[in-house]
Amino acid sequence: MKKLTYEERGAKFAEVLAKRFEGCVTFDDFRREIQRYNTTHVRKLNWDYGVSRIAILRADYVIKFDFAPTGWFSDGHAGNCSSEEAVYARAVADGMEHLLAKTTVLTFHGLTCSIMPRIKGVGTRYGWERTVTPKEEAWLFDNLKDLHKYNYGFRKGKICVIDYAWDAVEPVTQTSDWETSSSYESMTCETSTTWNSFSPVTDSVIFSFA
């Protein structure tokens, strides 16, 4: 039997999850359905909101659900998969697509999701600048907003930016360290994995099997 790729495995499971999430209109509905799933399955579903490098490093595959553009949740969240695709298209036009992780965007039961690629190593505080040329560095700063260590990893020795569409409409102020950018500071409060810290301003939820 042909072994499925991580995109194919992720797509099959994303369809199962999306069907379970039909009828969920609040964060509590959504959270309750995940807990219900975990009580009836041997392989527990891990989750995190926003971006999660640890999940991408350890997971068999990673599924990122974005809230539907029409406001899947009753509080009116908007999805950003279309923004991610637009940023990737701009990268292709500029010959810089190799800097970005290419996600597989799918829609099941009205819910948009993307199957995330796996990265070999998370970003380190110092070292990203040794993997890019001055032209590549300039493109990243001119086109992406959230260039902090939780948003990139390394693939084949080169930087690979993940989740690059988050509010990607304004360039950051270039500094000697991406972690000192205002976007990094604004994102650090959104990295907790506890239920009680589920942020009302996050735009996505990531699922994976450890």
Language-model features, listed with the residues they occupy:
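Protein kinase catalytic-loop region centered on the HRD/HxD motif
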Residues: E136-N143
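Conserved structural core of kinase catalytic domains
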Residues: F67-P69, A89-T133
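Active-site-adjacent loop/helix micro-motif of nuclease/hydrolase catalytic cores
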Residues: T70-E84, G123-T131, E170-V172
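Protein kinase-like catalytic core scaffold
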Residues: Y61, S114, C160-I162
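Catalytic activation segment of kinase domains across protein kinase-like and atypical kinase folds
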Residues: K145-T191, W195
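Juxta-kinase regulatory segment immediately upstream of eukaryotic protein kinase catalytic domains
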Residues: M1-V42
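Generic beta-strand structural signal
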Residues: L57-R58, T107-F108, F154
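ATP-binding glycine-rich loop module of kinase domains
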Residues: R43-R90
